[in-house]
Design a protein with these regions (language model features):
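Soluble, non-transmembrane alpha-helical interaction regions
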Residues: 1-86
Length: 86
């Protein structure tokens, strides 16, 4: 009986592609840059949040932060996939 991993491997067309050290480093750099952008967005939002009193504005700021983080993460995923496809 085959494991789920073996079945998935067969369906995907073979062995998983091993990444070269250069590609691994590119991906690591992309991840570091994305984490830095997320950290900067959080810090900026925290500073703005400290001066806000209107609950609606606070909700908008939090929603904007969530959207910005999602955009950064989606962009990271696309860039990582492009590196893997090279």
């Amino acid at each position: 009986m085959k494991s789920a991993w073996e079945l998935a491997l067969e369906r995907s067309g073979g062995a998983l592609q091993e990444l070269s050290p250069e590609k691994k480093e590119k991906i690591a750099e992309l991840e570091r840059a994305a984490q830095a952008k997320i950290a900067a967005a959080k810090i900026t939002a925290e500073h703005k949040l400290a001066t806000m009193t209107d609950p609606d504005e606070i909700d908008q700021l939090k929603e904007g932060l969530v959207n910005e983080i999602r955009f950064i993460e989606e962009s990271l995923a696309r860039k990582k996939e492009a590196v893997r496809a090279e």
